[in-house]
Amino acid sequence: MKDNVAHRITGAVKLFTGLLAASLLNGQIATAKPLVHDAEYYVLEKQNGETWALEDKDLDKRLAEFRKKNGGRSPNIFYILIDDIGFGDLGDETLNAIRGYKTPNINEFAREGMRLARMYTEPSCTPTRVAFMTGRHPVRNGMGNTAVDISGFGLAEGEVTIAEILSEKGYNTSHVGKWHMGDIREAWPNMQGFDYAAFPIHQQGQLTIYHDDAADEEISIGIGKNNYDDRYTMDEWLRTDASSMVTGVEGVRGENVREVYMDAGERWTEAKYHEMNERYQSQAMEQLRKLAKSNKPFFLQYWPLYPLTGPRTTTDQYTTPNGGVYVEKMKLVDKWIGELMTEMDELGIADNTLVVIMGDNGHFTKYSPGSGYTPMVFRGGKGSTLEGGVRVDAFVRWPGMIEADSVAGDIIHVSDLFTTIARLGDATDEIPTDRIIDGIDQTSLLLNGDTYSRRDYVFLYNINNLEAVVKEQYKLDLASGKENAILAKFYDLFRDTREEWPVSTEVGAWGGAKFVRMVQRHMGRKAKYPDAPPATGMPYAGIDNLRPETQAAVQEFLYMMKTPGM
């Protein structure tokens, strides 16, 4: 009897050892380290963890069923991020009518999927893109600021992006359009997990505001080839010259890139900017067709430069009642998105593709009202942590998995897409566990709908400064209490969408201490997981065909960075 038991125990031990070894080889150990989140997540997990665990079992079953029907493959991911579009500008015919223009294709897309009514982003371009790509608040990796010129810094290669994570699970990856995460080699998309990338090194400041056409229309003053009197000019390096900076480049994973469609001595113009936008639309379409032919799932990222524009040089004259230059270009972007959605239908991939369309931050109010956009539901715009700066339209579609024509009123942050997409791509085990991941897995929200979010809070940074905290419908404006915390203002965002009527006594009396502790817990995590600076390096190193004027611009930058006092 003892021999029998001993034999069974020995066999069990061998079986367990074999299973453990297999698990080690596959990197799928049941006791793998969990993700590290911010402190507030654990407050919610303590109270809701058992419910979430039950939900996860059902979600895993549904995702497994999808993969089985899809030939064992995870869904394709198509992410479209539109620049400087505030809340209420897309996806709704009534609000379109108020604005005096139409976005019929995005409106139809919104009806086919879920509207994320409380999508929060960062206040400007670069930080929102970093938050999506890394699942982390940009303050954690030094990428909270937005560079508009040659800068010599960018996203560090040590950051793990959603493209890298999905690549590990067999996804083909492509990026087309705006990037804006640095002008150094390690920061570029083809060095951050994308197999193919076509993108401008910089952003629309260079591409549509700094050039001669913009100076001719006085969108910019004091620059341009023939737009100022230079009799008193001593510092020839003072003025940014769009034509001397690198414009658009193309490349493949791990290799140098090449600047395209810009010859030595050529001036950058609004017409060339328009051609760049048309080219990116064509390349997005080409990549969609190419990726759809593969037997692997794909992650396609398309970040248009339009609707941002400056001069009316390439803008049809008032084809909408609104007539603003951004609005006229948004009409074009809507047309282009419609073409991409139609192509997905024709390729037969719509049902196995998760598509997200959203804005990156609020309106660029500096150019209001000529742009055609002004804040509507919320107050504030780009560069602000008022709701108008960080609340955007966001729509997500996955036929058969996400309920059509639905609305989620839960809080969600752009960083949550990182963690959620990783799970949908069966790649959660590729997310690093040696750093804080701010993004929360929101698969339950997408597949179960309204009230299933796993987040009821968001921390709002402006560059490196924590300026506001949102919890449920209440917002603490930390900026208003810089001199004295007692003076910090509370707002009820349901009753006061424009943050004009503080309820500091009514909410602060019971919630003030709770919010202070939230901030203390958040800051306390930084002792173990401190914020890091961005990567630095030689601007444009890794571009094989730098023009002579670009090489001179780099030398000017390097000299100014090493002058006394720097």
Task: Indicate residue ranges for each PLM-predicted region.
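Metal-dependent active-site segment of extracytoplasmic phospho-/sulfohydrolases and closely related
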Residues: 105, 297, 303, 332-370
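Long, internal low-complexity/basic segments
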Residues: 30-75, 82, 87, 115, ...
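A short beta-strand-to-alpha-helix junction
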Residues: 72, 96-103, 120-124, 149-160, ...
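Core domains of carbohydrate- and sulfate-ester-processing enzymes
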Residues: 34-51, 117, 127-130, 190-262, ...
